[in-house]
Amino acid sequence: MAADGDWQDFYEFQEPAGSVQEQENCNASPEAGAGAHAGGDSFPALASSLEEKLSLCFRPTSEAEPPRAAVRPITECSLLQGDEIWNALTDNYGNVMPVDWKSSHTRTLHLLTLNLSEKGMNDGLLFDASDEEELREQLDMHSIIVSCVNEEPLFTADQVIEEIEEMMQESPDPEDDETPTQSDRLSMLSQEIQTLKRSSMSSYEERVKRLSVSELNELLEEIEAAIKQYSEELVQQLALRDELEFEKEVENSFISALIEVQNKQKEHKETAKKKKKLKSGSSQNGRSERSHMPGTYLTTVIPYEKKSGPPSVEDLQILTKILHAMKEDSEKVPSLLTDYILKVLCPT
């Protein structure tokens, strides 16, 4: 019986079919061993019986045994679900009412500390009806935008200048009595100049009347010489002005011709690229009567020798003629280019 109590925990590992028979064998084996070897050494018998019991208890289970449930690990959630203290805390947490700040004791102490009163606040917030209406009109953005849109168009600069002059004339100057303005000073200066002219003319007439005939002849010769000198200088200045104007015209014509030729060369390059892409036999049917291909003279390179100063007017005229011929793709380009090389680059 003692053996049954000791090995009761190992019976669950035995097969369900022969569990009773095996238990009887386990219970009967020690008695048989004890009877057989009662007279001899009992230690080997006990050892052999213990080995038999262990082999019966720890032998592998058969495939016919029903599967047992899988072992589930114990997690924190499973522990908290069965905890009474945790359930009591979480169940009562949602039932707590929020704190009303206005009716709290802290709010009353706060108001007392700030020394606020509803009467003073209301008095400060009250506005006069007229002030409120004026403020509303000032803050009316719609009326402001509409008024800006409906305004008259902008004045020109001349109109603004005229209005400023009218305002200057209409506005009284408080310092008129004390200090004269710039216009008054100018008028005074003009009056003084007129008086000086009159006095000089009168004095000059008196001085001429006092001169003798010989002195008058000398004065006349001096005046004629001065007139001749001034006339020659005037003619020279007019001729110089004409030369400068002509030089400017030549330079402008040269620049315009150069720009036109450059644009023509760009167009020619684009058309040449387009013609290369086209694969048709229209070139044989559409022959031109010209003796050269179109654009032959347009890409002519004009030799130029850089000098210390700018090119002269004659050089610019020759270059302008060559550029015009290049623009028109004329056959005169070789002859003009030859004349330019012989006369300008390599003069004899």
Curated annotation (Swiss-Prot):
Keywords: Coiled coil, Disulfide bond, Phosphoprotein
Disordered: region residues: 11-40, 265-296
Coiled-coil ranges per UniProt: 206-280
Modification Phosphoserine occurs at: 130, 171, 190
UniProt key word Coiled coil: yes
InterPro entries per record: FEZ (IPR011680)
GO biological process: negative regulation of autophagosome assembly
Keyword Disulfide bond: yes
Function: Involved in axonal outgrowth and fasciculation.
Quaternary structure and interacting proteins, as annotated: Homodimer; disulfide-linked. May form heterodimers with FEZ1. Interacts with synaptotagmin.
Similarity comment: Belongs to the zygin family.
Name of the protein in question: Fasciculation and elongation protein zeta-2
Originating organism: Mus musculus
Upper lineage: Eukaryota, Metazoa, Chordata, Craniata, Vertebrata
